[in-house]
Amino acid sequence: MAPLSCNPPEWEDDERMSFLFSAFKRTRDVNTCDWDGKMKFWIPLILTHARAQGLLSITLSQLENDFRRKGCAPMGLRTVIQEMIRQGTLRKETDFVSGVSSGWLSWGMRQLVIRPLRWTIGTMLGSQVGPDEPLVIPEVIKERAALVLQRYQSSTFRSFPLLCEEEVHTLCAEICPNPSALNLVLLQLQGDKKICVLERAGQKLVKFVRVSVGQVEPISESDLGIYQLQQGEKLLSERLQSAGEESNRLTEEARTYNRAGNKNQALRCLRKRKLVERRITELQNKQDNIQGILERISAAETDRKVVSAYQMGVSALKQALKDVTLEKAESIVDQIQEYCDLQDDLSQTLSSVTDADVDSDDLERELNEILQNEEMIIDLPDVPSGPVIISPKRPTEWKMDQAAHSPADGSFLRSVPEPMLQ
């Protein structure tokens, strides 16, 4: 039994699980609550378990074994699976495969472990599900397909127009650990028009959709030509590595023979090394030529994209200026200037209304009066700055103080009234 990744809360409740493990009624109408309660428990649990275990397909017998509890298997799983097929959360593997073009079936069907297609009425209606019949989970397959597409677009393979079968397996090894899962994911990608498959000279080639492109384009002769060049470069690299290793080996053998005093064998090894080095030079020249062609193709592709961007920009600019002409622009500018002049005239006219009722002579006379008043204010004497009396003094004290500051003849005291001196 595969351990459940997350046991539901009811799993330890014997009474509740006894009910959930029991068989369904013959029809839902007999007991709606009983039927719906079991479905709400089992359907999410099956999907969660499959996703946690990394399963893209399941079988009835597998689920009965995985959900076995205290030696008992759930009795209603067949009914649950039939309901999931009706809802579309599960699909028979045969139905899933049959929806893809025959070009892919020639590859996928040899690797998928499925039963032969039996186009009987019962199979087409989905009324019977065998205990070992594979059932795929479309939701999980779509998630894996999206991961594979992201992996391709972020890997070094994105610069390859075509991938061979071995390269596809390398790309998807972590996401799809077995061939059956890989083919289900590739079938989904092909159904979504994210990949295109071609068989050529007994070799399967896959083309992935480019970044920011909705659907994959059919494999063209240009794609095949670039693929052949890349394969040729790869082959030359392998031969160069092998020739380099052979050259090093012959050098070591020549040194060994020379130390042993076998000069003839040492010279023979050196002659072979010369031939190998000549072959290395030829291989290197061929590889350089192929790399130069690939670089030119890449540059041409870049130029094509730039020209396409220019064309789109010109089309957008043309569309933006569709109803705009030089005459119309000049006419609009003239109208703007005309209305600006009109506004200036209106402002001047409105501001002159208040000035018409005021006599300029009166204004000038009023201004002169204001200036004269300012001059009078300026000519006033300064404010006295003598000492300030802080506290009142008695009359005698005040008299003595004034006498000290008055003239010697005492004229000031005589001018002061007598009552003030008392």
Swiss-Prot record:
Coiled-coil portions: 234-304
Region: Disordered, residue numbers: 394-422
Gene Ontology cellular component terms for the protein in this record: cytoplasmic side of plasma membrane; ESCRT III complex; multivesicular body; nuclear envelope
Compartments, as annotated in UniProt: Cytoplasm; Nucleus envelope
Principal localisation: cytoplasm
Keyword Isomerase: no
Keywords: Coiled coil, Cytoplasm, Nucleus, Protein transport, Transport
Mitochondrion recorded as keyword: no
GO biological process terms on file: exit from mitosis; late endosome to vacuole transport; late endosome to vacuole transport via multivesicular body sorting pathway; nuclear membrane reassembly; protein transport; vesicle budding from membrane
Function: ESCRT-III-like protein required to recruit the ESCRT-III complex to the nuclear envelope during late anaphase. Together with SPAST, the ESCRT-III complex promotes nuclear envelope sealing and mitotic spindle disassembly during late anaphase. Plays a role in the endosomal sorting pathway.
Family: Belongs to the SNF7 family.
Protein name (database record): Charged multivesicular body protein 7
Gene: chmp7
